[in-house]
Amino acid sequence: MEKVNQTFFLSHGSPTLSIDDSLEARQFFKSWTQKVLPQKPKSILVISAHWDTKFPSVNTVLRNNTIHDFSGFPDPMYKLKYEAPGAIELGKRVKELLMKEGGMKRVDEDTKRGLDHGAWVPLMLMYPEADIPICQLSVQSNQNGSYHYNMGKALASLKDEGVLIIGSGSATHNLRKLDFNITDGSPVPWALEFDHWLRDSLLQGRYGDVNEWEEKAPNAKMAHPWPEHLYPLHVVMGAAGGDAKAEQIHTSWQLGTLSYSSYSFTSSL
Protein backbone atom coordinates (compact mmCIF):
# COMPACT_ATOMS: atom_id res chain seq x y z
CA MET A 1 0.00 0.00 0.00
CA GLU A 2 1.44 3.35 -1.05
CA LYS A 3 1.26 6.11 1.53
CA VAL A 4 -0.18 9.51 0.63
CA ASN A 5 2.16 12.16 1.99
CA GLN A 6 -0.02 15.19 1.23
CA THR A 7 -3.39 16.60 2.17
CA PHE A 8 -5.21 19.24 0.13
CA PHE A 9 -7.55 22.18 0.60
CA LEU A 10 -9.54 22.97 -2.53
CA SER A 11 -11.65 26.07 -3.11
CA HIS A 12 -14.61 24.75 -5.09
CA GLY A 13 -16.12 28.16 -5.89
CA SER A 14 -19.41 28.23 -7.77
CA PRO A 15 -21.34 25.11 -8.87
CA THR A 16 -20.85 26.43 -12.44
CA LEU A 17 -17.34 25.02 -12.12
CA SER A 18 -19.01 21.82 -13.32
CA ILE A 19 -19.77 23.19 -16.81
CA ASP A 20 -18.00 26.54 -17.38
CA ASP A 21 -14.84 25.96 -19.42
CA SER A 22 -13.88 29.63 -19.13
CA LEU A 23 -12.99 29.22 -15.45
CA GLU A 24 -9.27 28.88 -14.77
CA ALA A 25 -10.05 26.70 -11.77
CA ARG A 26 -11.83 24.17 -13.97
CA GLN A 27 -8.67 23.67 -16.00
CA PHE A 28 -6.67 23.33 -12.78
CA PHE A 29 -8.90 20.55 -11.46
CA LYS A 30 -8.92 18.78 -14.82
CA SER A 31 -5.10 18.72 -14.82
CA TRP A 32 -4.97 17.21 -11.31
CA THR A 33 -3.45 13.82 -12.07
CA GLN A 34 -0.98 15.28 -14.56
CA LYS A 35 0.25 18.25 -12.56
CA VAL A 36 -0.61 17.79 -8.88
CA LEU A 37 -0.95 14.17 -7.78
CA PRO A 38 -0.14 11.44 -10.33
CA GLN A 39 -0.40 8.81 -7.59
CA LYS A 40 -3.80 7.08 -7.50
CA PRO A 41 -5.04 6.82 -3.90
CA LYS A 42 -6.63 3.71 -2.42
CA SER A 43 -9.62 5.80 -1.33
CA ILE A 44 -10.61 9.42 -0.71
CA LEU A 45 -11.89 11.13 2.42
CA VAL A 46 -13.49 14.45 1.49
CA ILE A 47 -14.53 17.04 4.05
CA SER A 48 -17.08 19.33 2.40
CA ALA A 49 -18.37 22.68 3.63
CA HIS A 50 -21.81 21.70 2.36
CA TRP A 51 -22.39 18.99 4.96
CA ASP A 52 -22.80 20.78 8.27
CA THR A 53 -23.99 18.73 11.25
CA LYS A 54 -24.14 19.14 15.02
CA PHE A 55 -21.93 16.08 15.51
CA PRO A 56 -19.30 14.67 13.13
CA SER A 57 -20.91 12.42 10.55
CA VAL A 58 -19.55 10.07 7.90
CA ASN A 59 -21.45 8.59 5.00
CA THR A 60 -21.28 4.80 4.81
CA VAL A 61 -22.86 3.79 1.51
CA LEU A 62 -22.16 1.18 -1.15
CA ARG A 63 -22.37 3.76 -3.93
CA ASN A 64 -22.49 7.55 -3.70
CA ASN A 65 -25.49 9.22 -5.28
CA THR A 66 -25.12 12.76 -6.64
CA ILE A 67 -26.73 15.52 -4.56
CA HIS A 68 -27.66 18.60 -6.61
CA ASP A 69 -27.78 20.93 -3.60
CA PHE A 70 -28.10 24.21 -5.52
CA SER A 71 -30.92 26.06 -7.24
CA GLY A 72 -31.35 28.51 -10.10
CA PHE A 73 -28.53 27.16 -12.25
CA PRO A 74 -28.59 25.93 -15.89
CA ASP A 75 -30.55 22.72 -16.47
CA PRO A 76 -27.59 20.64 -17.71
CA MET A 77 -25.99 20.89 -14.26
CA TYR A 78 -28.86 18.89 -12.73
CA LYS A 79 -28.22 16.02 -15.12
CA LEU A 80 -24.60 15.58 -14.10
CA LYS A 81 -23.85 12.45 -12.09
CA TYR A 82 -20.77 11.28 -10.22
CA GLU A 83 -21.60 7.90 -8.76
CA ALA A 84 -18.29 6.85 -7.28
CA PRO A 85 -18.25 3.80 -5.02
CA GLY A 86 -18.70 4.38 -1.32
CA ALA A 87 -16.02 3.60 1.25
CA ILE A 88 -17.85 1.97 4.14
CA GLU A 89 -14.72 0.60 5.79
CA LEU A 90 -13.06 4.01 5.59
CA GLY A 91 -16.12 5.63 7.14
CA LYS A 92 -16.00 3.24 10.07
CA ARG A 93 -12.25 3.82 10.41
CA VAL A 94 -12.80 7.60 10.48
CA LYS A 95 -15.40 7.14 13.20
CA GLU A 96 -13.02 4.93 15.19
CA LEU A 97 -10.15 7.42 14.93
CA LEU A 98 -12.28 10.44 15.83
CA MET A 99 -13.51 8.69 18.95
CA LYS A 100 -10.27 6.96 19.94
CA GLU A 101 -7.64 9.54 18.94
CA GLY A 102 -9.83 12.64 18.89
CA GLY A 103 -11.74 11.91 22.08
CA MET A 104 -15.10 12.59 20.47
CA LYS A 105 -18.06 11.12 22.30
CA ARG A 106 -20.34 10.85 19.29
CA VAL A 107 -19.75 10.30 15.58
CA ASP A 108 -22.75 9.45 13.40
CA GLU A 109 -22.97 7.23 10.33
CA ASP A 110 -25.29 8.23 7.50
CA THR A 111 -26.23 5.19 5.42
CA LYS A 112 -28.14 7.14 2.74
CA ARG A 113 -26.30 10.35 1.95
CA GLY A 114 -24.17 10.61 -1.20
CA LEU A 115 -21.87 13.44 -2.29
CA ASP A 116 -22.88 17.12 -2.24
CA HIS A 117 -21.59 19.53 -4.87
CA GLY A 118 -18.68 20.60 -2.69
CA ALA A 119 -17.41 17.05 -3.11
CA TRP A 120 -18.57 15.80 -6.50
CA VAL A 121 -17.97 18.89 -8.64
CA PRO A 122 -14.18 19.07 -8.10
CA LEU A 123 -13.82 15.28 -7.89
CA MET A 124 -15.66 14.82 -11.19
CA LEU A 125 -12.99 16.98 -12.84
CA MET A 126 -10.07 15.45 -10.93
CA TYR A 127 -11.04 11.78 -11.20
CA PRO A 128 -13.63 11.57 -14.00
CA GLU A 129 -13.56 7.76 -14.06
CA ALA A 130 -15.40 7.77 -10.68
CA ASP A 131 -13.65 4.52 -9.74
CA ILE A 132 -12.06 5.50 -6.42
CA PRO A 133 -14.07 4.75 -3.23
CA ILE A 134 -15.10 7.98 -1.49
CA CYS A 135 -16.25 8.73 2.04
CA GLN A 136 -17.50 12.16 3.09
CA LEU A 137 -17.07 13.75 6.53
CA SER A 138 -19.14 16.68 7.80
CA VAL A 139 -18.08 19.94 9.45
CA GLN A 140 -19.55 21.48 12.59
CA SER A 141 -20.20 25.20 12.15
CA ASN A 142 -21.08 25.42 15.86
CA GLN A 143 -17.39 24.71 16.63
CA ASN A 144 -14.17 26.61 15.83
CA GLY A 145 -10.99 26.26 13.80
CA SER A 146 -8.99 24.54 16.54
CA TYR A 147 -11.71 21.92 16.93
CA HIS A 148 -11.48 21.06 13.23
CA TYR A 149 -7.66 21.13 13.34
CA ASN A 150 -7.74 18.58 16.15
CA MET A 151 -10.23 16.52 14.17
CA GLY A 152 -7.66 16.39 11.39
CA LYS A 153 -4.88 15.42 13.80
CA ALA A 154 -6.94 12.41 14.85
CA LEU A 155 -7.18 11.33 11.20
CA ALA A 156 -3.49 11.76 10.31
CA SER A 157 -2.73 8.02 10.26
CA LEU A 158 -5.11 7.56 7.32
CA LYS A 159 -2.39 8.91 5.04
CA ASP A 160 -0.28 5.86 5.89
CA GLU A 161 -3.21 3.69 4.83
CA GLY A 162 -3.30 5.12 1.30
CA VAL A 163 -6.15 7.56 1.91
CA LEU A 164 -6.19 10.93 0.14
CA ILE A 165 -7.63 13.55 2.51
CA ILE A 166 -9.25 16.52 0.74
CA GLY A 167 -10.95 19.52 2.30
CA SER A 168 -13.37 21.24 -0.08
CA GLY A 169 -14.45 24.74 0.89
CA SER A 170 -13.53 28.25 -0.22
CA ALA A 171 -10.74 30.65 0.67
CA THR A 172 -13.37 33.42 0.63
CA HIS A 173 -17.11 32.88 0.75
CA ASN A 174 -19.55 35.78 0.96
CA LEU A 175 -22.30 35.13 -1.58
CA ARG A 176 -24.03 38.44 -0.82
CA LYS A 177 -20.95 40.29 -2.04
CA LEU A 178 -20.56 38.57 -5.41
CA ASP A 179 -20.18 41.25 -8.10
CA PHE A 180 -21.68 40.10 -11.40
CA ASN A 181 -20.27 43.21 -13.10
CA ILE A 182 -16.73 41.92 -12.63
CA THR A 183 -16.07 39.54 -15.49
CA ASP A 184 -12.30 39.86 -15.94
CA GLY A 185 -11.28 37.61 -13.04
CA SER A 186 -10.02 40.46 -10.87
CA PRO A 187 -10.66 40.57 -7.08
CA VAL A 188 -12.00 43.39 -4.92
CA PRO A 189 -9.53 44.78 -2.35
CA TRP A 190 -11.06 43.40 0.87
CA ALA A 191 -11.25 39.87 -0.55
CA LEU A 192 -7.71 40.03 -1.90
CA GLU A 193 -6.39 41.24 1.47
CA PHE A 194 -7.96 38.28 3.28
CA ASP A 195 -6.80 35.85 0.59
CA HIS A 196 -3.22 37.15 0.83
CA TRP A 197 -3.28 36.94 4.62
CA LEU A 198 -4.42 33.33 4.41
CA ARG A 199 -1.77 32.51 1.80
CA ASP A 200 1.05 34.14 3.75
CA SER A 201 -0.03 32.54 7.04
CA LEU A 202 -0.13 29.08 5.49
CA LEU A 203 3.13 29.39 3.56
CA GLN A 204 4.91 30.68 6.67
CA GLY A 205 3.56 27.80 8.76
CA ARG A 206 1.51 30.03 11.06
CA TYR A 207 -1.20 27.41 11.47
CA GLY A 208 -2.06 28.67 14.95
CA ASP A 209 -2.99 32.04 13.44
CA VAL A 210 -5.14 30.30 10.83
CA ASN A 211 -6.93 28.41 13.60
CA GLU A 212 -7.70 31.81 15.14
CA TRP A 213 -8.54 33.46 11.82
CA GLU A 214 -11.63 35.24 13.16
CA GLU A 215 -9.41 37.32 15.47
CA LYS A 216 -6.22 37.45 13.39
CA ALA A 217 -7.29 37.92 9.77
CA PRO A 218 -8.21 41.22 8.09
CA ASN A 219 -11.83 41.40 6.90
CA ALA A 220 -12.54 38.02 8.48
CA LYS A 221 -16.29 38.49 8.84
CA MET A 222 -16.58 39.97 5.36
CA ALA A 223 -14.67 37.08 3.79
CA HIS A 224 -16.57 34.45 5.80
CA PRO A 225 -19.84 35.65 7.37
CA TRP A 226 -20.29 31.97 8.29
CA PRO A 227 -17.27 29.75 8.97
CA GLU A 228 -18.21 26.44 7.35
CA HIS A 229 -16.33 27.06 4.08
CA LEU A 230 -13.01 27.49 5.91
CA TYR A 231 -13.30 24.56 8.32
CA PRO A 232 -12.30 21.90 5.76
CA LEU A 233 -8.96 23.75 5.61
CA HIS A 234 -8.41 23.26 9.33
CA VAL A 235 -9.10 19.54 9.06
CA VAL A 236 -6.51 18.97 6.33
CA MET A 237 -3.97 21.19 8.14
CA GLY A 238 -4.36 19.03 11.23
CA ALA A 239 -4.15 15.81 9.25
CA ALA A 240 -0.90 16.96 7.62
CA GLY A 241 0.76 17.78 10.96
CA GLY A 242 2.23 20.87 12.57
CA ASP A 243 5.51 20.56 10.66
CA ALA A 244 3.84 20.19 7.26
CA LYS A 245 4.89 22.51 4.46
CA ALA A 246 2.10 24.38 2.69
CA GLU A 247 2.16 25.30 -0.98
CA GLN A 248 -0.36 27.30 -2.98
CA ILE A 249 -1.24 25.09 -5.94
CA HIS A 250 -3.81 27.36 -7.60
CA THR A 251 -5.20 30.87 -7.44
CA SER A 252 -7.93 32.55 -9.50
CA TRP A 253 -11.08 34.59 -8.90
CA GLN A 254 -14.72 34.68 -9.95
CA LEU A 255 -17.16 37.58 -9.62
CA GLY A 256 -14.73 39.73 -7.67
CA THR A 257 -15.01 38.08 -4.28
CA LEU A 258 -14.88 34.31 -4.80
CA SER A 259 -11.35 32.97 -4.43
CA TYR A 260 -10.29 29.61 -5.83
CA SER A 261 -7.03 29.58 -3.85
CA SER A 262 -6.07 25.97 -3.17
CA TYR A 263 -3.25 24.45 -1.14
CA SER A 264 -1.26 21.29 -0.60
CA PHE A 265 0.22 20.29 2.76
CA THR A 266 3.21 17.96 2.58
CA SER A 267 3.88 16.06 5.79
CA SER A 268 7.41 15.89 7.15
CA LEU A 269 8.83 12.37 7.03
UniProtKB/Swiss-Prot annotation:
Top EC class for this record: oxidoreductase
Cofactor or coenzyme needed: Zn(2+)
Gene3D superfamilies for this protein: LigB-like
Enzyme Commission number(s): 1.13.11.-
Keywords (A to Z) from UniProt: Dioxygenase, Metal-binding, Oxidoreductase, Zinc
Matches recorded under Pfam families: LigB
Miscellaneous section: Arabidopyrones are derived from phenylalanine instead of tyrosine like other ring-cleavage-derived plant metabolites.
Physiological role: Opens the cyclic ring of caffealdehyde between carbons 2 and 3 or between carbons 4 and 5. Involved in the biosynthesis of arabidopyrones.
Protein name as annotated: Extradiol ring-cleavage dioxygenase
